[in-house]
């Protein structure tokens, strides 16, 4: 069974993400997902925002295996989103109490962050 990671971040059209950065971020996320899956992880990217809420995220946590939740740098690195960060942590604790919570801050690559807690297991 592979390690299952949900990477939660802002919708790419969120006002805090500059429009000129959105294509680069989308490409980076797509490459990241492919790289993590190639490394043996079940890696899903989930989009949410304070405006859209966390109901879909909660539903995924309750209905799909989740070993860890990686909170993206757009949330972690923005002090204005600290309450949203707390809501993500709270939702994770409620719906997937055994899941590890990981923060991505762009100073360390995602795989390194994930492998602090998990080594990929073969499928």
Predicted regions and their residues:
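Ser/Thr/Gly-rich flexible loops in soluble cytosolic domains mediating phosphotransfer, phosphorylation
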Residues: 87-123
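Short, glycine/charged-enriched secondary-structure capping and boundary segments
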Residues: 20-23, 59, 83-86, 116-118
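Glycine- and acidic-residue-enriched helix-capping/strand-helix junction motifs
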Residues: 15-28
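Short helix-loop-beta junction
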Residues: 31-42
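Short beta->alpha junction loops
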Residues: 43-52, 104-107
């Amino acid at each position: 069974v592979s390690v299952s990671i949900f990477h939660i971040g802002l919708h790419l059209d969120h006002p805090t993400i500059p429009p000129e950065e959105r294509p680069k971020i989308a490409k980076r996320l797509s490459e990241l997902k492919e790289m993590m899956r190639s490394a043996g992880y079940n890696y899903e990217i989930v989009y949410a925002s304070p405006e859209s809420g966390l109901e879909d995220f909660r539903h995924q946590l309750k209905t799909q295996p989740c070993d860890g939740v990686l909170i993206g740098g757009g949330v972690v690195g923005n002090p204005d989103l600290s309450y949203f960060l707390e809501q993500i942590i709270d939702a994770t604790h409620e719906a997937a109490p055994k899941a590890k919570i990981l923060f991505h801050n762009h100073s360390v690559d995602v795989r390194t962050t994930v492998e602090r807690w998990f080594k990929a297991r073969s499928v």
